[in-house]
Regions:
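Single-pass type I membrane-protein transmembrane alpha-helix
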Residues: 259-284
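N-terminal V-set
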Residues: 54-94, 131, 182-202
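Beta-sandwich strand segments
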Residues: 59-62, 130-144, 239-244
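Conserved Ig-like domain signature around the intradomain disulfide
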Residues: 47, 116-126, 172-174, 187, ...
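Flexible inter-domain hinge/linker segments at boundaries of tandem extracellular adhesion modules
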Residues: 18-33, 70-75, 138-160, 192-198, ...
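Short edge beta-strand/loop segments characteristic of extracellular beta-sandwich folds
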Residues: 50-54, 173-179
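N-terminal Sec-dependent signal peptide, specifically the hydrophobic helical h-region
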Residues: 1-45, 118-121, 131, 147, ...
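Extracellular beta-strand/loop-rich beta-sandwich domains predominantly from IgSF
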Residues: 37-40, 93-116, 129, 162-165, ...
């Protein structure tokens, strides 16, 4: 009997330990945030920091959640807060959440980027009571998942992809693209050529990076040979960059100056030659 009791006690203790381990693991796993570690930020422009999270409160509407972004070294130094008075003066009117907290989206936008906005910045979530909007004890700062901004004083030049040579009278397509980190205010790509066929695409290339692409199609003429074509990218905030290349047009030989006189000559010969032959046969 004692051994049976010992077996039961051992089984019970093992069960409790397993249950505690599982609960602890599940609890810690519920407070999670996914934030890019580093992202480029063009000075004077804007940057959008992708962020998603999970919490212990289950499915809650945005009104029951409070999202805060703060400096890593000082949780009270808020760069974004729904209470405007709690935002650091340097960041007032420059930050907003572009994601919906109720959809576990904590994506942050910073506009008018300054060269000292480098961070690191961390996200904090608080569960609140709807009746008075006071935070509950359920809150978490994701200080192990923060973002640092890599400051860019100048924008990168656009990338141009093109065929080496254009053919006179045939469609010629060239593509200009630029990488950026502000999908809420995308760069504007323009050409120094007029064309009714310009197609623009925007593509998410992950980790907070986006690509804006402009494809230009023209039908070059002989006069366009050695013409310089420029693609200009204008970023939010006014900074610009450009890329220029020289268009080489392959000429199509025109043989009309040979064909037309030959046809005229043959026609004239036939016009006057045939009656002469007929008359010669008649009087022969």
């Amino acid at each position: 009997i004692p051994s049976r009791n010992m077996d039961n006690e051992t089984k019970f203790m093992i069960t409790c330990m397993l249950f505690t381990a599982i609960c602890s693991s599940a609890s810690s796993a519920e407070w999670k945030a996914t934030v890019v570690k580093s992202i480029d930020a063009l000075v004077t422009s804007c940057v959008v920091v992708p962020c998603s999270f999970s919490h212990t409160g289950g499915n809650l509407p945005t009104s029951r959640l409070r999202g805060i972004w703060h400096e890593k070294d000082d949780k009270k130094s808020n760069i974004y807060h729904e209470d405007y008075t709690l935002i650091e003066n340097n960041f007032k009117d420059r930050t907003q959440l572009v994601g919906r907290l109720g959809q576990n989206n904590c994506t942050l936008e910073i506009t008018g980027v300054k060269d000292h906005d480098n961070g690191p910045f961390c996200f904090r979530v608080e569960l609140v009571r709807t009746e008075n909007n006071d935070p509950t004890k359920d809150m978490f700062s994701f200080v192990d998942n923060c973002v640092e901004l890599k400051m860019l004083p100048e924008p990168a030049e656009p990338t141009v992809i093109k065929p080496m040579t254009a053919t006179q009278g045939e469609p010629y397509t060239v593509t200009c693209s630029v990488i950026h980190t502000c999908p809420t205010h995308v760069p504007k790509l323009t050409w120094n050529l007029d064309s009714t066929k310009v197609i623009v695409h925007h593509k998410d290339i992950k980790q907070g990076n986006w690509e804006t692409q402009s494809s230009l199609t023209v039908i070059p003429e002989e006069k366009d040979d050695n013409r310089e074509i420029t693609c200009t990218a204008e970023f939010n905030g006014g900074l610009k960059s450009s890329e220029t290349f020289t268009l080489h047009v392959k000429h199509i030989e025109n043989y009309n100056h040979i064909i037309i006189p030959a046809v005229v000559g043959i026609g004239t010969a036939l016009l006057f030659g045939i009656p002469c032959i007929l008359m010669a046969k008649k009087y022969k």
